[in-house]
Amino acid sequence: MSLVEELKTRNFSIYGQWIGVLCIILCIALGIANIFHASLVIIFSIICIVQGLVVVFVEIPFLLRICPVTERFSNFIRFFNQNWPRAAFYIGMATIQYCSLIFMTTSLLVPAVFLTITSMCYALAALKHQEFTGSSTLGGAGIARQIL
């Protein structure tokens, strides 16, 4: 199934996965950009970089197969193979980034907003009783089944 066909299915978990990929880029890039602040924002930028790296494994499942990770980390990532856990995971990460606003308003607000949008996509998929579906472009369909 091509990317366009996947997007036409109106499955919000696929939308969430693609916005999650955008979150990877935003978290890593803006985490690095904000690491040069001379305030407690540095802590949140480091957390944002780590969040981006964790989301890489959550959203691109075949990386668990090719990257050497511990069994504990692998089980942690596999826990998020349903819509509700992913929605909670993303809203939790967004909340952490929203807390950075306490110290200073920075561009870390952008990952927080996109993490919230991703969470809403997964929550909508769960509320509409849509089965969690990974994008085949990102290694979802056949490859994800072999891993799990």
UniProtKB/Swiss-Prot annotation:
Keyword Transmembrane listed? The answer is: yes
- Any idea where this protein resides? Golgi apparatus membrane
Q: One of this protein's GO BP terms?
A: vesicle-mediated transport
Could you list this entry's UniProt keywords, alphabetically sorted. Glycoprotein, Golgi apparatus, Membrane, Transmembrane, Transmembrane helix
Instruction: Output the SMART domains linked to this UniProt entry.
Output: Cg6151-P
Q: Name one Pfam family in it.
A: Cg6151-P
Classify the protein's membrane topology as the record does: Multi-pass membrane protein
Can you supply one Gene Ontology CC term for this chain's record?
Answer: Golgi membrane
* InterPro entries from the UniProt entry: TVP18/Ca-channel_flower
Q: Which residues cross the membrane?
A: 18-38, 40-60, 84-104, 107-127
Glycosylated residues?
11
Its family remark reads: Belongs to the TVP18 family.
What does the UniProt function comment say about this protein?
Golgi membrane protein involved in vesicular trafficking.
This one is known as Golgi apparatus membrane protein TVP18
